Regions:
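C-terminal substrate-binding subdomain of Rossmann-fold SDR/epimerase-dehydratase oxidoreductases
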Residues: 1-117
Length: 117
């Protein structure tokens, strides 16, 4: 976009995939469960997490009444940036979410102070 995009134009950057919100939550929970299964030290660092007691992170999901105008899914059409500028994503949604989760698990000192007391 910086080198080939036109000034004043808008480009959606994405992977041309669509997920509903609940599927994203399930994916995140499943990835968290896999981390706890693979790394026993996480149970010591996060003793209140479901994975610490052998439960699934999905146990934390609570269904509530939707707010008016609730978006049940989000989609980005990146065809313009792909066609005009040759953009191609380097990550799938799944690998990007996995890398994000791994970053948070590796950088507890950054996010822990942000939690409410």
């Amino acid at each position: 976009v910086l080198l080939r995009g036109e000034v004043g134009e808008t480009y959606n950057i994405g992977g041309n995939n669509e997920w509903n919100n609940l599927d994203i939550v399930h994916l995140l929970c499943d990835q968290m469960d896999a981390r706890f299964a693979a790394d026993p030290s996480l149970a010591q660092r996060f003793p209140d997490a479901p994975g610490s007691s052998g439960r699934s992170a999905r146990d934390l999901i609570k269904f509530v009444e939707d707010r008016a105008g609730h978006d049940w899914r989000y989609a980005i059409d990146a065809s313009r940036i792909m066609g005009e500028l040759g953009y191609k994503p380097h990550e799938t949604f799944e690998t990007g979410l996995r890398r994000t989760l791994d970053w948070y698990l590796s950088n507890e000192d950054w996010w822990r102070p942000l939690l409410p007391a």
